[in-house]
Amino acid sequence: MAGHSKWANTKHRKAAQDAKRGKIFTKIIRELVTAARLGGGDPGANPRLRAAIDKALSNNMTRDTLNRAIARGVGGDEDNNMETIIYEGYGPGGTAVMVECLSDNRNRTVSEVRHAFTKTGGNLGTDGSVSYLFTKKGVISYAPGLEEDTVMDAALEAGADDIVVYDDGAIDVFTAWESLGAVKDALDATGLVAEGAEVSLIPSTKAELDAETAPKLLRLIDMLEDSDDVQEVYHNGEISDEVAATL
């Protein structure tokens, strides 16, 4: 949907996927455990862990649950053989797709990812085939209703790189991904309440989808997210309001 924030576009379906909350929590816990195992349990010194904590809180995970996950990671629990794997590919309509996975079995994971691409008319690419189109950034999102100048002044003072205001009034604040936690803390201190905060891969170009290719891309994303090994799916597909109305 052109002119709308990514919360209403590339991830717009997530709001309607409450049935998947259990699976989402499982994936977030896996990331918390892995981040704590690799970088320690102090989010101030571990940007990956801080990003995972922000994501957990954005999804209404309790502090008790996330603290237990961190403790498991620091203690070297059963997820110690998990590794991060990034797959790249081409989706319907020539879209560029990045698939971030946490897995203890590369063969299983690549088989599931390749199957999703093949079933929806896309194809799995090689390393570097589309990653050059994406930049890793921190994103802090605000719902419509805030004054643009207020958010902009606070964001720049907090050390943010950029802000984008969408047609619906939603605002995204972009930061270096390592600075996401510090910038969010500074914005929180001003009284601004974020709708969400996460590390994301931001595309430099967009691929416009039509009424035929848009449903195929959404199916690809759903198939990928149904895999227990897939943590996040990023893409550069753009769905216009007119096309979205037909879905």
Curated annotation (Swiss-Prot):
Locations listed in the record: Cytoplasm
InterPro entries: Integrase-like_N, TACO1_YebC-like_2nd/3rd_dom, TACO1_YebC_N, Transcrip_reg_TACO1-like, Transcrip_reg_TACO1-like_dom3, YebC-like
Record keyword Acyltransferase present: no
Keyword hit for DNA-binding: yes
GO terms under cellular component: cytosol
GO molecular function list: DNA binding
UniProt KW keywords: Cytoplasm, DNA-binding, Transcription, Transcription regulation
Source species, domain of life: Bacteria
One of the GO biological process terms: regulation of DNA-templated transcription
PANTHER family: TRANSCRIPTIONAL REGULATORY PROTEIN YEBC-RELATED, TRANSLATIONAL ACTIVATOR OF CYTOCHROME C OXIDASE 1
Protein family according to the UniProt entry: Belongs to the TACO1 family.
Protein name as catalogued: Probable transcriptional regulatory protein YPO2055/y2255/YP_1898
Originating organism: Yersinia pestis
Organism placement in taxonomy: Bacteria, Pseudomonadati, Pseudomonadota, Gammaproteobacteria, Enterobacterales
